[in-house]
């Protein structure tokens, strides 16, 4: 590869990464305009919020739902690989970021917040802080980059481990969250409420 080819490739990748950063910034601005709180109303930021049905859940840097966002990264890497195989990795990341950011905006809309509160165990859920939502997107990116480098089998094993572990500890995970959001099962809601 010539020096000119390398320079072109670096500039091309830089374009895609700047576009990725722009999506994250747009997500943050949109959530601010939606009236989301920047950080936890408690006034401080924690690295980890271990409570599930607490006022601090979905308000700090990470929580029990962080593994779900890492799994999003695994899944979105796979999707990008399938439909954008010939595009640079950063272009596939842009697709993943657009999906994740779109989900974060939808998740923090009154429609989905109300749905969570009526159909799932998240009775006191009032939406994510902007910081938590942005970090959810960053964790998705970490999952994406992990999936891009790790063997598929390892990525699948880690996803299964995350699902089983969080399901056991907090009685919720990505699979249950999606199920309860789309097609609530009363028996699961009762089981989750027993935590």
UniProtKB/Swiss-Prot annotation:
<keyword id="KW-0812">Transmembrane</keyword>
<keyword id="KW-0472">Membrane</keyword>
<dbReference type="Pfam" id="PF10755">
    <property type="entry name" value="DUF2585"/>
</dbReference>
<feature type="transmembrane region" description="Helical">
    <location>
        <begin position="14"/>
        <end position="34"/>
    </location>
</feature>
<dbReference type="InterPro" id="IPR019691">
    <property type="entry name" value="DUF2585"/>
</dbReference>
<dbReference type="GO" id="GO:0005886">
    <property type="term" value="C:plasma membrane"/>
</dbReference>
<comment type="similarity">
    <text>Belongs to the UPF0314 family.</text>
</comment>
<feature type="transmembrane region" description="Helical">
    <location>
        <begin position="64"/>
        <end position="84"/>
    </location>
</feature>
<feature type="transmembrane region" description="Helical">
    <location>
        <begin position="128"/>
        <end position="148"/>
    </location>
</feature>
<keyword id="KW-1133">Transmembrane helix</keyword>
<protein>
    <recommendedName>
        <fullName>UPF0314 protein RHE_CH03951</fullName>
    </recommendedName>
</protein>
<keyword id="KW-1003">Cell membrane</keyword>
<feature type="transmembrane region" description="Helical">
    <location>
        <begin position="150"/>
        <end position="170"/>
    </location>
</feature>
């Amino acid at each position: 590869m010539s020096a000119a080819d390398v320079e072109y490739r670096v500039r091309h990748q830089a374009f895609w990464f700047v576009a990725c950063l722009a999506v994250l910034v747009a997500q943050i601005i949109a959530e601010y305009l939606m009236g989301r709180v920047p950080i936890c109303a408690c006034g401080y930021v924690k690295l980890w919020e271990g409570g599930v049905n607490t006022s601090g859940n979905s308000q700090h840097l990470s929580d029990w739902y962080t593994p779900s966002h890492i799994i999003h990264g695994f899944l979105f890497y796979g999707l990008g690989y399938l439909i954008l195989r010939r595009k640079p990795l950063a272009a596939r990341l842009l697709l993943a970021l657009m999906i994740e950011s779109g989900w974060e905006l939808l998740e923090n809309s009154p429609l989905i917040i109300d749905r969570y509160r009526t159909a799932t165990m998240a009775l006191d859920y009032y939406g994510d802080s902007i910081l938590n939502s942005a970090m959810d997107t960053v964790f998705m990116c970490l999952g994406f980059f992990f999936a891009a480098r790790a063997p598929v089998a390892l990525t699948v094993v880690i996803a299964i481990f995350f699902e089983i572990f969080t399901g056991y500890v907090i009685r919720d995970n990505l699979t249950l969250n999606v199920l309860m959001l789309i097609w609530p099962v009363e028996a699961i809601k009762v089981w989750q409420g027993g935590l």
